[in-house]
């Protein structure tokens, strides 16, 4: 009898990729997808540890799942509960202490061993904890990816050696590791053969990817652009310190590389950037932005900002607001600083009051909303090539994404799903654009 798997994903795009690969790993055991946890024989929570609230959400969800697990047992069945990802890596033993009904706890580098963990949990009847950083890369043991839809994530780099003072990633994802170019290109070819037209390369420091013998991310993207069927390429998340001339030239020369770049800066204050151990200052970032926009005049930028970092003064915060205006970010992910246990910033004495964080976050988000809407309105009348990837909400409507990641609605025939078509933007909605055939 077929078994059903439900995976709930928290956090970043890397977790989305990992969740899909966990499903691939478990498919040979007979697990097919479930739409809801209530239908599942196995539930995996793939977790994020970036902020405190994200971790607490996991424990809250486990409380709900415990009831489903008990109901399944009363009906004579079994629901395997697994916690994966960065919370599992950082707090594996705490998870088993607070939620002893969990069957499997595994880190982000060990999910290729899930079949063995499932078998071990069934044999022993107790919890399995696997949060090692194995010497062998997990990618060497994963099956071919299962392509669904017209867009896909492709992990090329994991881990981080930057050790920003606020961040847990070096501790939960481990040291930086780059997948071999041949493996990346083979996976891209498999995805394209399955109908994928847009590939987003993923990494904690994706532009730090290196393949030896002169291979950097720019060269990898050039090779990826030669893969038959790949029409659009993106990459995230990049670090300003790893943005080299070869990659910038790729933005200038490759039409497949979308003119939208997520380049996190976190703060516009030199003092705070130094306290964060970001390894660059404000002017270095601005010079990099100028260089990128000179190479690719149509380029639009997004970023991450942390407000209320320990010691952030009103002047520091205003420097961030000024940087947002100067760069003209069309999108940002902005967050209140959240102390993460074990990081240097958590031990800093000058913590900012929550009320101040709330006010600053509201100001940043209001400014960014204004800039986003200005950018969207500036798109009206422009012709763009849109990848149509699904039916829209209304009959006869399709939904796609612009080169700048904006959702775009158009009246079009269903057979155009999976194609890149020229459209003219005609109208701005609060969360999307409207278009007609160009």
UniProtKB/Swiss-Prot annotation:
Binds 2 [4Fe-4S] clusters. One cluster is coordinated with 3 cysteines and an exchangeable S-adenosyl-L-methionine. The keyword rRNA processing does not apply. Keywords: 4Fe-4S, Cytoplasm, Iron, Iron-sulfur, Metal-binding, S-adenosyl-L-methionine, Transferase, tRNA processing. It catalyses: N(6)-dimethylallyladenosine(37) in tRNA + (sulfur carrier)-SH + AH2 + 2 S-adenosyl-L-methionine = 2-methylsulfanyl-N(6)-dimethylallyladenosine(37) in tRNA + (sulfur carrier)-H + 5'-deoxyadenosine + L-methionine + A + S-adenosyl-L-homocysteine + 2 H(+). Pfam families: Radical_SAM, TRAM, UPF0004. The keyword Cytoplasm applies. Its main location: cytoplasm. Signal peptide: none annotated. GO terms for molecular function: 4 iron, 4 sulfur cluster binding; metal ion binding; N6-isopentenyladenosine methylthiotransferase activity. InterPro entries: Elp3/MiaA/NifB-like_rSAM, Methylthiotransferase, Methylthiotransferase_CS, Methylthiotransferase_N, Methylthiotransferase_N_sf, MiaB_methiolase, rSAM, rSAM_horseshoe. GO terms for cellular component: cytosol. It is found in: Cytoplasm. Residues 3-123 form the MTTase N-terminal domain. Its EC number is 2.8.4.3. Belongs to the methylthiotransferase family. MiaB subfamily. Catalyzes the methylthiolation of N6-(dimethylallyl)adenosine (i(6)A), leading to the formation of 2-methylthio-N6-(dimethylallyl)adenosine (ms(2)i(6)A) at position 37 in tRNAs that read codons beginning with uridine. Monomer. This is tRNA-2-methylthio-N(6)-dimethylallyladenosine synthase.
């Amino acid at each position: 009898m077929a078994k059903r798997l439900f995976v709930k994903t928290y956090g970043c795009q890397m977790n989305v990729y990992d969740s899909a690969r966990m499903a691939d790993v478990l498919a040979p055991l007979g697990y097919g997808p479930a739409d809801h946890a209530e239908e599942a024989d196995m539930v995996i929570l793939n977790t994020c540890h970036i902020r405190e609230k994200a971790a607490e959400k996991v424990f809250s969800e486990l409380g709900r799942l415990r009831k489903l697990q008990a109901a399944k047992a009363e009906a004579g069945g079994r629901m395997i509960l697994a916690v994966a990802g960065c919370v599992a890596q950082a707090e594996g033993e705490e998870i088993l202490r607070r939620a002893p009904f969990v069957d499997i706890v595994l880190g982000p580098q060990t999910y290729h061993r899930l079949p063995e963990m499932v078998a071990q949990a069934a044999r022993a009847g107790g919890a399995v904890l696997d949060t090692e950083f194995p010497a062998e890369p997990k990618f060497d043991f994963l099956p071919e990816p299962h392509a669904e839809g017209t867009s896909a994530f492709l992990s090329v780099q994991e881990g981080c050696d930057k050790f920003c003072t606020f961040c847990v990633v070096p501790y939960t994802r481990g040291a930086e590791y780059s997948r071999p170019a041949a493996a990346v290109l083979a996976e891209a070819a498999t995805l394209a053969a399955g109908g994928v037209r847009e590939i987003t390369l993923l990494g904690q420091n994706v532009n730090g990817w290196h393949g030896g013998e002169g291979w950097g991310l720019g060269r990898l993207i050039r090779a990826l652009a030669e893969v038959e069927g790949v029409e659009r390429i993106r990459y995230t998340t990049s670090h300003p310190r790893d943005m080299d001339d070869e990659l910038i030239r790729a933005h200038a020369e490759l039409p497949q590389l979308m003119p939208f770049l997520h380049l996190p800066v976190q703060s516009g204050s030199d003092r705070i950037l130094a306290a964060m151990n970001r390894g660059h200052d404000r002017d270095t970032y601005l010079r990099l932005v100028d260089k990128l926009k000179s190479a690719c005049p149509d380029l639009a930028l997004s970023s991450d900002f942390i407000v209320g970092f320990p010691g952030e003064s009103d002047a520091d915060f205003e420097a961030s607001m000024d940087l947002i205006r100067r760069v003209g970010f069309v999108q940002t992910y902005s967050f209140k600083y959240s102390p993460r246990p074990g990081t240097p910033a958590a031990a800093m004495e000058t913590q900012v009051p929550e009320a101040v964080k709330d006010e600053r976050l509201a100001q940043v988000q209001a400014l960014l909303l204004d800039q986003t809407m200005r950018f969207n309105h500036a798109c009206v009348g422009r012709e763009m090539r849109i990848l149509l990837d699904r039916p829209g909400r209304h009959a006869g409507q399709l939904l796609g994404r612009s080169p700048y990641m904006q959702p775009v609605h158009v009246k079009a025939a269903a057979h155009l799903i999976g194609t890149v078509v020229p459209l003219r933007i005609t109208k701005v909605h609060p969360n999307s654009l409207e278009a007609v055939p160009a």
